[in-house]
Curated annotation (Swiss-Prot):
Reactions catalysed according to its record: N(7)-methyl-GTP + H2O = N(7)-methyl-GMP + diphosphate + H(+)
GO aspect biological process, one term: nucleotide metabolic process
Keywords for the protein's UniProt record, in alphabetical order: Cytoplasm, Hydrolase, Nucleotide metabolism
Keyword hit for Hydrolase: yes
Keyword Repressor: no
Role this protein plays: Nucleoside triphosphate pyrophosphatase that hydrolyzes 7-methyl-GTP (m(7)GTP). May have a dual role in cell division arrest and in preventing the incorporation of modified nucleotides into cellular nucleic acids.
InterPro entries: ITPase-like_fam, Maf-like
PANTHER family on file: 7-METHYL-GTP PYROPHOSPHATASE (PTHR43213:SF10), BIFUNCTIONAL DTTP/UTP PYROPHOSPHATASE/METHYLTRANSFERASE PROTEIN-RELATED (PTHR43213)
Protein name: 7-methyl-GTP pyrophosphatase
Enzyme Commission (EC) number: 3.6.1.-
Native organism taxonomy: Bacteria, Pseudomonadati, Pseudomonadota, Gammaproteobacteria, Alteromonadales
Signal peptide, first to last residue: none
């Protein structure tokens, strides 16, 4: 019997992405401490948090197949997460203006019953346009990207902030790498293309 698919996230963006695959799924709030550890790299951080989210989800769904995802950006060698407010969003976008920024998304798929864990990091690179302070403020006020790593929504007006995007899956930038997820699901016997 196929275990129930659970998204360990309350993100409406991740839920909307997962719905694209046409699979029935539930969701839960993983409620974990997302603080980085001392000297932890961005890749290690998102991998650890994605795994932790699946394990937290498994406490609610002990027979589930749990999906966990986490994302950060790196600007000038510093890990950047969600801005949480207008001031921080403007600061993040000002720092990113004219630069090439890499986003790292950790994706984990955990079979709670068997203990099998598959976790990987998917990078995605963004080339920001040179942005004026007025453009940044106008964007932040229009889209209020306070709960998005890097302070933008690439699926919306945020696309106007960029010169170029580089990566295997544009969904990665929104927070859930669907190409990688479909590969992981296939390894669990779930083919999203099957009848």
């Amino acid at each position: 019997m196929t275990p129930q698919l659970i998204l360990a996230s309350t993100s409406v963006f991740r839920q909307a992405l997962l719905q694209k695959l046409g699979l029935a799924f539930g969701s839960c709030n993983p409620d974990i401490d997302e603080s980085p550890m001392t000297n932890e790299s961005a890749q290690d951080l998102v991998l650890r948090l994605a795994k932790a989210k699946t394990k937290a989800g498994a406490t609610h769904f002990p027979h589930g197949l749990i999906i966990g995802s986490d994302q950060v950006a790196v600007i000038d060698g510093k890990i950047i997460g969600k801005p949480l407010n207008r001031e921080n969003a403007i600061k993040q976008l000002s720092q990113a203006s004219g630069k090439v920024i890499t986003f790292y998304t950790g994706l984990a798929l955990y079979h709670a019953e068997t203990g099998e864990m598959n976790a990987q990091v998917e990078p995605f690179t963004v080339h920001f346009r040179q942005l004026s302070a007025a453009q940044i403020a106008a964007y932040v006020d229009k889209e209020q990207p306070f709960y998005c790593a890097g302070s933008f929504k690439s699926e919306g007006l945020g696309i106007a902030l960029f010169n170029r995007l580089e990566g295997r899956d544009p969904n990665t930038l929104i927070g859930l790498p669907l190409i990688l997820l479909t590969e992981m699901l296939l390894n669990q016997g779930i083919d999203v293309l099957a009848d």
